[in-house]
């Protein structure tokens, strides 16, 4: 068997892996795991990834989870162009630094916006208290300012003049609120960086990867399996 990637492009980490593999001509079989139908909890998928998370990579008998680890693996195995994960000690450390920071500072609050503004009301029929949304938006504003001041500064990209894995991961995570028609790219510096990253990836590939996300408001959640809906409703309580 060749390389298999288990993904749902609603997930920002999955989009990062998908875009990287497609951009670099890495051949793979796309194994779709539907998050909205709870397929990541299926017996078949748990055998692939007991953590029940996406994405997962299967390369022969070797199985790997966690998107950052998968991106590093693909970089090394397929000898991706060096700008993605620079060999220079300090530039590579800068990528590593961002990857360590972004999990809680970018990924979590960006996902919260999508859940609070769209998914919770859509599935439960209840609005999240305004103060909860405002608190999350304040956190996002603060963290984006830190991103600009600490990581982007006055550079074209996080590591300098060329796109890296850090830029790719950052942008797909910041796109997550777009599923609820919320735009976080309000500063000119951030908006200009966003466009540079999109163009470096290729606009066609970029928007192909985000098509499922931007169409999420059109999802008919009445088709959701009752058992999965109950599990999601239990999960959503922590956002209320």
From Swiss-Prot:
PROSITE patterns: GST_CTER, GST_NTER. Glutathione binds at residues 40, 53-54, 66-67. InterPro entries: Glutathione-S-Trfase_C-like (IPR010987), Glutathione-S-Trfase_C_sf (IPR036282), Glutathione_S-Trfase (IPR040079), Glutathione_S-Trfase_N (IPR004045), GST_C (IPR004046), GST_C_Theta (IPR040077), GST_N_Theta (IPR040075), GST_Theta (IPR051369). Gene3D superfamilies: 1.20.1050.10, Glutaredoxin. Pfam families: GST_C (PF00043), GST_N_3 (PF13417). It comes from the Eukaryota. GO terms for cellular component: cytoplasm. SUPFAM superfamilies: GST C-terminal domain-like, Thioredoxin-like. This is Glutathione S-transferase theta-4.
